[in-house]
């Protein structure tokens, strides 16, 4: 146990003592192996697959998603992110909290899946937010964009399917409803044709009767 008595290093995350058997050092900071996690998704990190911003560590996927694609924040791509040794732990915590507040403040929910939509993946039309992956035609799953979609009764359609389902029918009733209404209409047509045929037969019989009476009178 003597090998542990002189250990006074504290974990950057939990501030508890780190023993040699559980120690991990990254960017001159000491962590418990279990505390070395992505600040965004909490997944366990390794020295070979992390990035950091202002001393806060992220998995590469979320670092790329949150910072690299925006091009607006300082970033590092070589696996050994930039480190400012003069910053204290409290300053780093404040910086991390500011970043967390920035992303946690995004409360837009996707109208399709009801999950949070971050600015980098957001499509917004008529004040309604969607994930890019969720912004598609509800009928055929076609890819659409804010410039080529049609919204009808709160649902999104590509122009092709909207015309196919609604405009060609001459009104905005659902296709299924129109098909249901069409069946009685066909029955009414058949009834009308039957009545016309019966009327013609009656007229023919009357004409034959009149001709017979005329012939009898002549005799």
From Swiss-Prot:
Chain intervals with Polar residues compositional bias: 203-219
Record's keyword annotation contains S-adenosyl-L-methionine: no
Record keywords: LIM domain, Metal-binding, Repeat, Zinc
Domain of life: Eukaryota
LIM zinc-binding domain: residues covered: 9-109, 110-167
Disulfide linkage: none
Low complexity bias spans: 185-202
GO molecular function: actin filament binding; metal ion binding
Organ and tissue specificity: Pollen.
SUPFAM superfamilies named among the record's database cross-references: Glucocorticoid receptor-like (DNA-binding domain)
Presence of the UniProt keyword Hydrolase in the record: no
Region (Disordered) location: 181-219
InterPro entries registered for this protein in UniProt: Znf_LIM (IPR001781)
A GO BP entry: actin filament bundle assembly
Coiled-coil annotated residue ranges, if any: none
Summary of the function given for this chain in its UniProt record: Could possibly involved in controlling pollen-specific processes such as male gamete maturation, pollen tube formation, or even fertilization.
Protein name: Pollen-specific protein SF3
Gene name of the record: SF3
